[in-house]
Structures are given as C-alpha cells and as structure tokens.
C-alpha cells in the first residue's frame, strides 16, 4: 500500500483524488464519489467533501493509499 503525506490537518476526498492523478479533473472526482466508486476505510462513501486525516485509507479502481 502506498502512502500519501498530507499538509495540514486534513485533505478533502475530491482534492486527494486530483492530487494523486486518479482522476483528470474536479468534475470527474465528484462523479466517481457520487457513483460509489471510492472506498473510505473499507466502505463506500458518497461524501465529496469528506475530510481525510492521517491513518485513513482510500481505495479507487484497484489502487489503495494510506494517508500519513
């Protein structure tokens, strides 16, 4: 599992998807979250502005990342 270091207290889910280049743009990030394509700590989550903190794990399209 790869790790991603965040700056500050948290990063929003759609910002993380864009920062990792898992999606091409913000609209696509919002769409994949709304369609239930993203897992947060092992469960599908539909919150686009979900605040991710160190220790959280995000999965999308066979990729997995842990925030540190």
What are these regions (language model features)?
Residues 9-54:
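A basic, amphipathic helix-loop patch mediating RNA/tRNA/ribosome contacts
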Residues 2-3, 57-68:
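A positively charged, amphipathic N-terminal helix/segment that binds anionic biomolecules
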């Amino acid at each position: 599992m790869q790790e991603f270091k965040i700056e500050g207290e948290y990063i929003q889910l759609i910002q993380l998807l864009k920062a990792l280049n898992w999606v091409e743009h913000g609209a696509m990030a919002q769409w994949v979250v709304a369609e239930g394509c993203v897992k947060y700590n092992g469960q599908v989550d539909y919150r686009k502005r979900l605040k991710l903190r160190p220790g959280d794990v995000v999965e999308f399209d066979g990729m997995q990342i842990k925030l540190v």
